[in-house]
From Swiss-Prot:
Its EC number is 4.1.1.23. SUPFAM superfamilies: Ribulose-phoshate binding barrel (SSF51366). Residues 177-196 are annotated as: Disordered. The active site is at K60 (proton donor). Pathway: Pyrimidine metabolism; UMP biosynthesis via de novo pathway; UMP from orotate: step 2/2. Substrate binds at residues 10, 31, 58-67, 117, 179, 188, 208-209. Homodimer. This is Orotidine 5'-phosphate decarboxylase. InterPro entries: Aldolase_TIM, OMPdecase, OMPdecase_AS, OMPdecase_bac, OMPdeCOase_dom, RibuloseP-bd_barrel. Catalyzes the decarboxylation of orotidine 5'-monophosphate (OMP) to uridine 5'-monophosphate (UMP). It comes from the Bacteria.
Length: 230
């Protein structure tokens, strides 16, 4: 699995994806989220793989254990590299997800979403009724994910250092909420730059609009890639 910045393909059609990817002449690591997957279906994955790109299928599965396990068994037949669930579904759900995934392709990495980068501490306390800091809530979910056999988590870069210190370097910390210094934060609340994410312990970063909405996506990608890889 490549250690490149993961480009979030926040589009709603195969045509838009093709138009974007046609600008690049190099292997990429891209993220297919719910919006795109639900609009285009699994066939898009094959066409992106034909271009030589790694794929993070970001569907954030969250249901009863049996349902998630069966769904993940189906997803394991797709040619993807990384997929995720919501850690809030619990350890049994995460274990069933892992079992389902390993039925057809044990090489696919499985990670768990801890807290969305749009979540604030006020939302955590008042809406989720979790009376801890975001850092403690993320670490709790990360610990459950690791104990369930998962490869890592999705978290903000702001929590990556704590997770790294507690759970080790090899446990993946895939971090959205990445913005260059001159970019808008959009709807992300807990954000950092690529350089800071690396320093804080992120193993992979996810970047969307600063690249996909850029006037020059290739140049913006290379700038972020250089900042990330050093």
């Amino acid at each position: 699995m490549k250690n490149l910045p993961i480009i979030a393909l926040d589009f709603d059609s195969t045509e838009a994806v093709d138009q974007f990817l046609d600008q690049f002449n190099e292997p990429l690591f891209v993220k297919i989220g719910m919006e795109l997957f639900y609009q285009t279906g699994p066939q898009l994955i094959a066409s992106i793989k034909d271009r030589g790109h790694d794929i993070f299928l970001d569907l954030k599965l969250h249901d009863i254990p049996n349902t998630v396990g069966k769904a993940m068994e189906g997803l394991s037949k797709l040619n993807i590299d990384l997929v995720n669930v919501h850690a809030a579904g619990g350890t049994e759900m995460m274990k069933q997800a892992l079992n389902g995934l390993q039925k057809h392709n044990p090489d696919i990495k499985l990670i768990a979403v801890t807290q969305l980068t749009s979540t604030t501490e006020t939302m955590l306390h008042k809406e989720q009724n979790i009376q801890t800091s975001i850092e403690e809530a993320v670490l709790n979910y990360a610990t459950l994910a690791q104990s369930s056999g998962l490869d890592g988590i999705v978290c903000s870069p702001l929590e990556a250092k704590l997770v790294k210190n507690e759970l080790g370097n090899d446990f993946l910390k895939v971090t959205p909420g990445i913005r260059p210094k001159d970019a808008s934060s959009d709807d992300q609340k807990r954000i950092t730059t690529p350089e800071d994410a690396k320093e804080l312990g992120s193993t992979h970063i996810v970047v969307g609009r600063p690249i996909t909405k850029s006037e020059n996506p290739v140049a913006s990608y290379h700038k972020i890639k250089e900042s990330w890889l050093g």
